[in-house]
Amino acid sequence: MSHYRSNVRDQVFNLFEVLGVDKALGHGEFSDVDVDTARDMLAEVSRLAEGPVAESFVEGDRNPPVFDPKTHSVMLPESFKKSVNAMLEAGWDKVGIDEALGGMPMPKAVVWALHEHILGANPAVWMYAGGAGFAQILYHLGTEEQKKWAVLAAERGWGSTMVLTEPDAGSDVGAARTKAVQQADGSWHIDGVKRFITSGDSGDLFENIFHLVLARPEGAGPGTKGLSLYFVPKFLFDVETGEPGERNGVFVTNVEHKMGLKVSATCELAFGQHGVPAKGWLVGEVHNGIAQMFEVIEQARMMVGTKAIATLSTGYLNALQYAKSRVQGADLTQMTDKTAPRVTITHHPDVRRSLMTQKAYAEGLRALYLYTATFQDAAVAEVVHGVDAKLAVKVNDLMLPVVKGVGSEQAYAKLTESLQTLGGSGFLQDYPIEQYIRDAKIDSLYEGTTAIQAQDFFFRKIVRDKGVALAHVSGQIQEFVDSGAGNGRLKTERALLAKALTDVQGMAAALTGYLMAAQQDVTSLYKVGLGSVRFLMSVGDLIIGWLLQRQAAVAVAALDAGATGDERSFYEGKVAVASFFAKNFLPLLTSTREVIETLDNDIMELDEAAF
């Protein structure tokens, strides 16, 4: 039986009952897509995920890739390669990709809903199968000649990587020392060592791999502004046919041994270190590497957040299934009666608290990433939110650190609740949750740690934006608070949401005050650093609380209209989880606000030896 538990019903509810993505279908760039098509695709990809994709999930963990230092190659488990090929052969990697690359137009919200299933069933499958998405980025950024290479890469199913990190340049990307030397034929020779490269090699899975590499051209300045982006293939190739030729000078020199996500080969790559030059080509023939790479980074951050959320969802659903069947103890109200019947653990208060917490974050975070995705297509953003393309970009930029940072942190934390639901059984490899936890920890680390996300969120997405995008989202929340949504059944919850909004606005004001005070005392910036992660997490809870209440309002209307059977249970669950979150989590923002408003620099002034 598959470990993966999907929730297509909740996706459909978000997309078409709450967000109104259906309004963007059947016309314009999405004229070939209707609601039935989208529903069918979600059902089909969930079946693929539960079957062929999930089949190698355990084996890939127990028998991870093997590195051969003599050939500088990585050998993947055969079962895992079958899972990757099942996704590629079905064409799911091309959904939402430009038609010029063999793709089909699809709103990003639907695309990410489809991706959720692959990421929840076997996340490394999605990572290895990302070549078409990277080819699209090259197609958008490249020269006319490079656009042809992108088409070849997509048509021939090449693998791909993003190559930023170095041993001494992790979060501090601007410290990168890998250099690029221009050649007479217009190509560049890349020289240096990169580390922590996902899918750096994959044996015979792909005929070729192209690396998008950040390197510093000879004579360029320091920091991120001195970096440029290069296209570096594993094999040089015929530019007309794509047929692979000579081996290029980029080789795997190590594969990391990791806590989780083991089947994803995390590689050290050496460029130009083995007697063969590593030939690369400047992407777009412009020296604008970090800005270009952010096209890749933003896609990666959305993926990481969705991966974390997908993992939490299947973790919760596994825990729920277990709790419904596990009989243990009597009802708490009969605890002194030794003859009382034994009950399933879903009858116990703390198990219910835990399950509802898992449900709140699994479904609230799903709503978060889908809401964010509706700003990733100008046409969808205009129809769904009434915003122009410029504001849509700003709101998407604002939300990405929330999806990635909050999604990764909350999913990892709440997966421990999923494991706890299973008791001692959860600690065993007989159940998938211990692997979920190991696989999910990386999500708060790569593609920018949570602290990096929080600083980006405050300094760039709020301060530099002058609060424009934040004001839009806050305005939507305030509009909901002021509405009569819920037909009289959500008054208490809306009042709690209003207080939470005020608290988050107070946090933003406090952090802004510390930033302004830094003009006279630069150490005031430390207070921003001390409060930024807590602020990001609080914004996440605020938005989750709001989106759950939006769902509850829709559910109340459906219940009032006479929903029956499973549908009635579904909608009742939506009302219950929104109320639970409002009453149990939103009030906690008040204390977080108090902490942020009274921050001091005591720990920054403490001697390091005292830690």
From Swiss-Prot:
BP-aspect Gene Ontology terms: fatty acid metabolic process
Source species, domain of life: Bacteria
Keyword annotations of the record: FAD, Fatty acid metabolism, Flavoprotein, Lipid metabolism, Oxidoreductase
InterPro entries per the UniProt record, alphabetical: Acyl-CoA_dh-like_C_dom (IPR025878), Acyl-CoA_DH_N_bac (IPR020953), Acyl-CoA_Oxase/DH_mid-dom (IPR006091), AcylCo_DH-like_C (IPR036250), AcylCo_DH/oxidase_C (IPR009075), AcylCoA_DH/oxidase_NM_dom_sf (IPR009100), Diverse_Acyl-CoA_DH (IPR052166), FadE5-like (IPR034188)
Cofactor(s) annotated in UniProt: FAD
Annotated phenotype, changing residue 294 to A: Increases affinity for eicosanoyl-CoA
Entry's EC annotation: 1.3.8.8, 1.3.8.7, 1.3.8.1
GO cellular component, one term: extracellular region
Family annotation (Pfam families): Acyl-CoA_dh_1 (PF00441), Acyl-CoA_dh_C (PF12806), Acyl-CoA_dh_M (PF02770), AcylCoA_DH_N (PF12418)
Pathway: Lipid metabolism; fatty acid metabolism
UniProt KW Lipid metabolism keyword: yes
Record has Nucleotidyltransferase as a keyword: no
Catalytic activity: a long-chain 2,3-saturated fatty acyl-CoA + oxidized [electron-transfer flavoprotein] + H(+) = a long-chain (2E)-enoyl-CoA + reduced [electron-transfer flavoprotein]; a medium-chain 2,3-saturated fatty acyl-CoA + oxidized [electron-transfer flavoprotein] + H(+) = a medium-chain (2E)-enoyl-CoA + reduced [electron-transfer flavoprotein]; a short-chain 2,3-saturated fatty acyl-CoA + oxidized [electron-transfer flavoprotein] + H(+) = a short-chain (2E)-enoyl-CoA + reduced [electron-transfer flavoprotein]; octadecanoyl-CoA + oxidized [electron-transfer flavoprotein] + H(+) = (2E)-octadecenoyl-CoA + reduced [electron-transfer flavoprotein]
Uppermost EC category: oxidoreductase
GO molecular function (one): long-chain fatty acyl-CoA dehydrogenase activity
Enzyme active site: 447 (proton acceptor)
Cysteines engaged in disulfide bonds, as pairs: none
Binding positions (a 2,3-saturated acyl-CoA): 171, 224-225, 301, 338, 447, 456, 460-461
Binding-site positions, FAD: 162-165, 171, 198, 326, 420-424, 449
Known partners and oligomeric status: Homodimer.
Similarity comment text for this entry: Belongs to the acyl-CoA dehydrogenase family.
Task of the protein: Acyl-CoA dehydrogenase that exhibits broad specificity for linear acyl-CoA substrates, with a preference for long-chain substrates.
PANTHER family, per the entry: ACYL-COA DEHYDROGENASE (PTHR42803), BROAD-SPECIFICITY LINEAR ACYL-COA DEHYDROGENASE FADE5 (PTHR42803:SF1)
Entry protein name: Broad-specificity linear acyl-CoA dehydrogenase FadE5
Organism, scientific name: Mycobacterium tuberculosis (strain ATCC 25618 / H37Rv)
Source lineage: Bacteria, Bacillati, Actinomycetota, Actinomycetes, Mycobacteriales
